[in-house]
Amino acid sequence: TKKKEIEIKTGKKIHVVAISAKNKNKKRQFKIDKKIFYSNPLKIFKSKKIDILFESIGLSDGISKKVVETALKNKVNVITPNKALIAKHGDYLSKLAEKSKVNLEFEASVAGGIPILRTIKESLATNKINKVYGILNGTTNYILSEMENSNETFDKVLQKAQKLGYAEPGNPKLDLNG
């Protein structure tokens, strides 16, 4: 399982202590233990000791921001692939994480999950980088590659990307605009 793989690579045990989602009864690829399910994610912080929060709600404001903000204020490390949240509130949340002496990790929200931030931070730390040019957006890269390889239209490939989960089903604007 992925859990075991992570435990082997990191040498750390993973204990899922709480899960929250809009719909508890939605069909998923895994079972949710009803004892650790919270319909209101903010209540998790009142009743559980959490080391890391994984946020994947996908909104820039509202509950996404409130959950991440609450976690950071409670000295909980945060991992999020939420592009919209980081684009709009990244500076504020980074400062809050720094103030709380915890990590805010969001590399999966940048460049289609390519570890570009770590590469720039660690491997190119002595270089002065003024600009980065290129398409650093996984959805757009997929669509352009697929259009070229299959000779299908943009709309058809976008629908395919949405079915595969590469682009949001309702409004893929954020996925396409980076």
Feature map (PLM): residue ranges:
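Alpha-helical scaffold segments in soluble metabolic enzymes
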Residues: T1, K43, I52, T70, ...
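Residue-level detector of short coil/turn "hinge" positions at structural boundaries
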Residues: I14-V16, V78, L104, F154, ...
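Rossmann-fold NAD(P)-binding glycine/threonine-rich loop
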Residues: L59-N74, P81-K121
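Conserved anion/nucleotide-ligand pocket segment
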Residues: E122-N177
